[in-house]
């Protein structure tokens, strides 16, 4: 999610390899010593260039960032419950598939952007821990000459259960991160996990830092999607992988009509009943319809420098997983 640059306050905890963001200008704002000599026509053109959409509403780029921030601040506490209610739980299967496609091995360094409540991060940690345990068992089986005492000591040793894996959860919204941290404590996730307040359009990390970049149901809320994609490319190591799970375009006419009916007539009502917030869920539905289709988004990913870009549509195209590599 993007917000006005003037609202961004970088924060970091857990490791010392990130950098703080410096002063930023507002998106679309241009200083000029010509000042008053700018013509009315050029001012009008600049104003149009700085316009974007907030759902079906046309707003300034500066205004969109603040509006999106307020949406997720409002829904943070009920965000996970609403995901279950709106998707009838299917979002869990989509996220599980994203992790299986990633197939992270022990030692993988993951950046999960717009991942505030931790759904992707927790799945990643569970997956790599399972992979690490399997690796350990294979190693023990190949060392037939170990005594039972040596085997017991190895299992009881306090080595990293994740095999050196790390997931950084980066989100621009403090409330979403707060919910994620509370969930992590409740589930006992402490090792290999850190939380960062940051903007997808200007990530507070060094170049060539991560093995994998994920963003699930977040990139459509970014003001400048192209900038977020360029940042994803920058922070990935050579050979690193970009994975995006996002709502997309339904490819069946009948299902599309039913989906529209459910989206516009049912989801805002659920939002009002469960979260007491009709408008936020009306925006979320509208933002899905404004997002590029599968092929258009694939082109945007390629324009950012990624190669071998592919996508897989799920549930008749309601969502899609896009994948690309930094080569």
Curated annotation (Swiss-Prot):
InterPro entries: SAM-dependent_MTases_sf (IPR029063), UbiE/COQ5_MeTrFase (IPR004033), UbiE/COQ5_MeTrFase_CS (IPR023576)
Transit peptide limits: 1-49
Record pathway: Cofactor biosynthesis; ubiquinone biosynthesis
Molecular function in Gene Ontology: 2-methoxy-6-polyprenyl-1,4-benzoquinol methyltransferase activity
Gene Ontology cellular-component terms listed: extrinsic component of mitochondrial inner membrane; mitochondrial inner membrane; mitochondrial matrix; protein-containing complex; ubiquinone biosynthesis complex
Disulfides per UniProt: none
Membrane topology summary: Peripheral membrane protein
EC class of the enzyme, as a word: transferase
Coiled-coil residue spans: none
UniProt keyword terms in alphabetical order: Membrane, Methyltransferase, Mitochondrion, Mitochondrion inner membrane, S-adenosyl-L-methionine, Transferase, Transit peptide, Ubiquinone biosynthesis
Family of the protein in this entry: Belongs to the class I-like SAM-binding methyltransferase superfamily. MenG/UbiE family.
Function: Methyltransferase required for the conversion of 2-decaprenyl-6-methoxy-1,4-benzoquinol (DDMQH2) to 2-decaprenyl-3-methyl-6-methoxy-1,4-benzoquinol (DMQH2).
Self-association state and partner proteins as the record states: Component of a multi-subunit COQ enzyme complex, composed of at least COQ3, COQ4, COQ5, COQ6, COQ7 and COQ9. Interacts with PYURF; the interaction is direct, stabilizes COQ5 protein and associates PYURF with COQ enzyme complex.
Protein name per the record: 2-methoxy-6-polyprenyl-1,4-benzoquinol methylase, mitochondrial
Lineage: Eukaryota, Metazoa, Chordata, Craniata, Vertebrata
